Amino acid sequence: MSKLPIVIAPDERLTTRASEVIDITDKIKELVNDMFETMYYAEGLGLAAVQVGVLKRIFIMDVQPEKAEDGPAGYESTGKFCMINPEITELSGEQVILKEGCLSIPEQSHEIKRPKYLTVKYKNLNNEEQTLKASGWLARCIQHELDHLNGILYVRHLSKLKYDMAMKKAQKVKRHYEQ
């Protein structure tokens, strides 16, 4: 396993829709292991393949019990997952505003409104179809990472003015990281 470099915004890879994974090969499994190592090193909750420069529909996340929230019966709010070719099949009408951050937009966090509950279909590393009902931070993390796979940065959910300010700050931070 090895730590991968994280793509920092602005970068066109972060605004490009990722392509579906056709075969779950040993190379894909190695990528996922490296992504977990990278995410833990960076102290993130989730990481999409596009954030390490791989334009494939894969993301990982590990939402620990301290982030748990009470949700409806049958909904998970914590857990460690690898989701391949994920697709949200249901979103709750109930929305909640919480502060989010992103490993690709360091040194920033913003309040984002998202649905509180969801259902997602995906494949795991064993190429098995899975369905998950998620709530709380787990649901939020799924939406955030799936946005990455669709070429959408979380700051796109802000007003134009706040988005422009966030990207201006991101440009300054990126220059600092590149030195």
UniProtKB/Swiss-Prot annotation:
Co-factor binding comment: Binds 1 Fe(2+) ion.
Catalytic residues, chain numbering: 145
UniProt-listed Pfam families: Pep_deformylase
E.C. number(s) listed in UniProt: 3.5.1.88
An MF annotation (GO) of this entry: metal ion binding
Keyword Plastid: no
Family: Belongs to the polypeptide deformylase family.
Protein name, UniProt field: Peptide deformylase
Species in which this protein is naturally found: Wolbachia pipientis subsp. Culex pipiens (strain wPip)
Lineage: Bacteria, Pseudomonadati, Pseudomonadota, Alphaproteobacteria, Rickettsiales
